[in-house]
Amino acid sequence: RPMIRHQTGPKDLVAVQSAYTAMDANADVHPFINDMAAAFAWADLVVCRSGALTVAELAAAGVASVLVPFPHAVDDHQRVNAEFLVRGNAGHCVIQRDLTVETLAQLLRQSRDQLLQQATAARALARPEAAQTVATICEELAA
């Protein structure tokens, strides 16, 4: 039986908790998750939006993902962000209007081997040295 950890925001907390309770789902619902690194480490699969920092964190954590880009993002940048992980075989992108119960259920039924392959691919895309690289370039330009 799947275990769910869901960040809702404070506005939707009670409604989401009630929905999971009604379904007898094994769900831990939070208005906000302070330690996202720990949450990603706990997860086999993350379903989320695809902001730039989120995509970078998914790669750094080495976790498989289903990315649902925010449909009103400027210049559709969240879809572009999601494609980075998709091209690297690290996740799936589902446009919000195409997200159905059936589509999500199919993605949630991926085998452990598939999830592990995606997680490994995500980790390979990570650039943990990026901040140091940018700092070095800035120092060189300033010199």
Question: What residue spans do the PLM features occupy?
Answer:
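Residues in the short beta-alpha loop(s) of Rossmann-like NAD(P)-binding domains
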Residues: 8-11, 71, 128
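Two-component system phosphotransfer/interaction surface
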Residues: 99-113, 135, 139
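Donor-nucleotide binding loops and adjacent catalytic segments primarily
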Residues: 1-48, 79-83, 92-104
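A short, well-ordered alpha-helix in the C-terminal region of glycosyltransferases
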Residues: 114-128
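C-terminal alpha-helical cap of glycosyltransferases
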Residues: 127-143
